[in-house]
């Protein structure tokens, strides 16, 4: 099975991939061998200018791995280095080599991120054809992200594999503490992912990977470099950019490696602000934004030279704080809303290998604060809403190899707590703003087995879930994936998976401001089947798939449009069925890359015509994306992104009229002058100045111009 190295490929759909390690020299350290476990090892350096095709194969029935790249045809083309295999992703509990696993994973690499015309992590996901990104404000002020026709509550957001979902509301899920420059890659797993990422991954999961690079070149998993990292070098990265609507963003990143202990530390900080692109009826700013982030991460090997146990530990801690004009986010009748959030993230992750047995324990704690003002700065007229959430979790994933394949098992405990002015049950001892609250715990067990043959892989398992809030017994959600490799270019895959999601605290208790919640909502459940085919050679990659989702008890906010005094109510939809098709094509020709993708969805639900949906039934019927990346000359590169979206559903205007969502197209472009130590760029978003909405009554900005520069200093 050949694996093709795709340079600057925006949102490559990939199957689980095994990290290829490249050794420039041997360190004779025990943890260097540990880094090789489950990965392909290559020795030496291969230049793109001389490498046409290379392949590495095993002599047993476990894996066949290779690589192909296009040679540089021009003398002035940048001289780049390529390894045989660039990305390791996880679509199963047990790590599997590329070409073995059946789950489809979409990967956005470091190079793709640098080429994108975006100001936030949220904007990066718009290019993934199966992902729906609905914005209520610019530069990541508030963004709802979902997959394959779901809602923002139905996906799991992970930071380095740690679940950071907010049990209060999915609206705050993307308050990430890391800057774009911290990211190594973004992984998108489409479809139910319960047995891989646990509960809340009803329609999929998104994993933001910021793991620090090992500048010594000895750590395999961390061998992928973030933007400022240079192998063997401590360094500092600076970024400064500005643009339309008073936009300004500054960031810095420091990477340090302590040679005696191999302790790696990365710390980053960023600040972003904007005046916004419109004003309220009273002439006040109502789409302004300001926010800052601080993020620290580190790792260190713990094994000694003589130890037979190989281990390492990594950790991260981060802070995200932002305030933004909420425009007409939650009510068209009030156009001076405001919201401020603060998020704290901490996690410690371990990895231990004892012979064939591997352990990956994790412990994490996240805290969030949220203050919402219906009338900005006027608490006397309408009291502010205050919320504080705490999430504590313990997770253990283990696996071992034996004659029948690879088996994974483990467990997770997650406790979710909220203190609020209006969410939850009355507290016995109120304090500060908080008079209401709720606490619930989720316990899950998982088991998975993988049968690995030369051309066939079968992965089957289940997750068993029990939540203290709900009266349902311990419930099992199974899944099975299969893939068949036909020759060196074709792959067939099929899967059946199931998952569930507990209601958020907002869905259970938010009964203010024209909303009425139901605290007796049932958990959502989904079962899905999927099948597809993938073809790839040195120039072309094609992938086509079809999927069917059968959902029970989907949660939504609905309103009876016949009643002028009606309020939004949280309800369970009995059944919702979704049929979808996806197609991806990528072409590489010398200095150019062209990527086209299309997704079509159709949902069937016996719903009364007078009921208006706020989330579940407002899905993208059609989404088309196109990316063109061209190396113009010398160090100058051009990236052009196009997106067409056609959304189902309706919304009620401030005048009481019911309107359907209209399809729209957006065109973005970026020119980048890239040298070894610096880059200068200019980009334009919404070049045609098109007026559109992702949510009713919340207009999005028109043409937005941004220019910036980055500079990397080796210490």
Q: Where is each model-derived feature located?
A:
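Short, acidic, small-residue-rich periplasmic hinge/interaction motif at the N-terminus
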Residues: 59-114, 122, 152, 353
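Extracytoplasmic beta-strand/coil segments of soluble accessory domains associated
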Residues: 90, 122, 126-162, 166, ...
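Short acidic/polar hinge/loop motifs at secondary-structure boundaries
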Residues: 163-192
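Periplasmic-side early beta-strands and strand-to-turn transitions of outer-membrane beta-barrels
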Residues: 194-195, 215-225, 241, 252-341
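Outer-membrane beta-barrel signature, preferentially recognizing the C-terminal barrel domain
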Residues: 229-231, 332-354, 387-389, 471, ...
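Face-selective signature of the C-terminal outer-membrane beta-barrel domain
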Residues: 299-321, 340-475, 479, 483-485, ...
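Gram-negative outer-membrane beta-barrel transporters
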Residues: 452-458, 548-550, 571-653, 688, ...
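C-terminal beta-signal and adjacent terminal beta-strands/loops
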Residues: 550-552, 644-651, 669-715
